[in-house]
Amino acid sequence: VLKKDEAVEKLKTLRSSSAQQRAYFDSFWSLAGVYTYADQWAYIAPKDNALSVSYLRNITDPRREDIRVTMNRIHADVTRLVSELDPMRIDYELVQRSVRYLVPKLIGKRFFDKYLKQVHALEILSEKNWARFIIGSMIVRRTLTAQGAERFVAGGEKRVRNFQPGVALTYPSEMLRDPSASTTNMARDEEIVAQEKPRTTNWLKRYFGADVKTQSKLGQLLRFQRQFQAAGGLGLDRHATASTLPAVLVQETYYQDPDEVRPWAWAMFSYCDPSVDRDRVIPLGKGLVKNPFFGLPFHPYHYDTQIASPWGRGAPHIQIAGQDILNIAITWLVRNMQAGSGKWMVEKNTMSPPEKARMLNNRLDEVIEYTKQNQYSAAPQRTPPTQVSPAVLDFINGAPTWMKDSLNLSDVQSGKTSKRGESGGAIELKLNQANAPLEMVRRRDDRTTEDLLMGLYCDVLNPRWARLDQVREVLGEDTPDEMVRALLRDDPKKYISHVNLLPSTNRPKTPSEQQQEITTLHGQGVIDNSEDALWELMLRGVNASSDMKNAHDKQLMEINQMLHEGEYVPVYMAENHGYEKRTVAWFVSQPAAMALTEEDRELLTQHYNDHYQAEMAEMQGQQMMQGSPEPGRPSPPSEAFRGSDMANAGAVAPAAQM
């Protein structure tokens, strides 16, 4: 079994062995930031016994000897990648181990849906994409945040505190991994993983109760991030490193133990004080403790993975070579534009240097005066202008296309076609081919997000900190108490085997695509009638019938009123009974309806029956109106009068009373 002293030594070894690799990746990632946001013309070179990003002077540098132009194509392609893989929702299903656990699964799904919104999980999954596509990797980690002050229980012998599980973003630069790591799957292939981050002493006091005195400042500890913060060109490095808050380096380390069945069984929180000894590791709290999370809490998302590499590559690293060539071509073109009509050619000793500087320019209102040495002296004249090759212009104009090609992006993904009149089948084939590389990234994202959701679900309902009152508050008062207790009765790992992420999370369809899909299914006979097609579209958020949408929303409000107030809402003849009746049936058919009480079901059943009776009465009235003559017109003869003398034929029917 792993001991605290052994855990401390392992962490010290990890910190010292990974320092050089971390320094290299800091420069590598900073270069990607420069090419995405800043002036480019950059490279990695040794400086002060370390690697750092260096720059050639460009057009914005007043010390330049000549101009260098930046035509940034990388930022546009990164933005496009981010928008292509931006999740719009989190759709998933919990898979229970047996039918016996159906109720905890259904109530757990309802609880977890609300909890994901509470911890802003969708925002975190969306924000990760910017860093992931720029530097190549980004980590979404599970967190435990202490809330409120400690409370004494059991006669003052024990102290308890509320903990709130959640999610947060972690940059790869904060991670400590063994330099021998050769895969991007740290949870599967490594034995020790740590996160090291500067934290203020107030943070340590708030979360660990440790009163640490130090001479180190937060700005000093952030210097390892300085070139990465400077990469965006906003001067963030100067502001962050100016902080004078007292701080130390805090490590959060997780260990595998061959003597434990549970993976990543141990965790240790510690800190280093660089002002005293930056290599000394001081454990916090109880030191080595059981891992409070379900497995390793770090979930990395990657873009372009390399063989035998611990991290992915971003789009800028793929496009840097092409971007440099484009910048060189643009710079050459602008230099030729500046040359105008060619250079001035002046006979020696006919003009002084001040006269040349004053008169030999492109201004039409400047007079050129020169001294003629003899009758054969030549006046100043320009040389022929530099000829711009059409091939260079074609190269520059084609740059956006071949730079997108390096990322496997295509114009057809933006709705552009290669020629007019191209068939829909050809466009769809091109689109599928263009989307194949992005689909591979989505599949990897799906697997990572499934692991993230499974871990977070087990963390949230962990019996160590899941409280009945907190779960009941999230679920609301309409959930029966016995179902809430059933949810907390067992460990989530006992009744949930895994999480399946649904395609709508990373592959959302536009309203027009959904409408086309439903229309096709209706045309093929998969959906029976047009009303079913309109209903399916409405449930997907595409409203093609205002009457159906209004009736659906109104009925949901009536259902909510009946369930919360316990009072019946009457039905009126003028309502759209068909749509509202369908809404009631749809509502009680959902898995969440398992939580309805018997009284709730009786109210909804009575409401449904009243809509049904009103609908039948309306249909009977319409039939009667169809069988009656219009006011002032004779009614048709009955069968009894057929063949008679029609003596009473032509009687006028009274007008229908409304």
Where are these regions (language model features)?
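Generic, well-ordered alpha-helical scaffold segments in large soluble proteins
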Residues: 111-118, 322-336, 340, 362-370, ...
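Short amphipathic alpha-helical heptad-repeat segments
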Residues: 573-585
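Charge-rich, acidic-biased intrinsically disordered regions
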Residues: 34-53, 143, 346-364, 420-427, ...
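Extended, helix-rich architectural segments
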Residues: 1-266, 270-272, 276, 388-398, ...
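Extended amphipathic alpha-helical segments with heptad-repeat/coiled-coil character used for oligomerization
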Residues: 143, 390, 424-550
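Extended, charged amphipathic alpha-helical segments
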Residues: 235-420
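Short coil/turn segments at secondary-structure boundaries
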Residues: 91-95, 123-131, 142-146, 337-349, ...
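Long, highly charged low-complexity segments enriched in Glu/Asp and Lys/Arg with interspersed Ser/Thr
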Residues: 528-558, 591-632
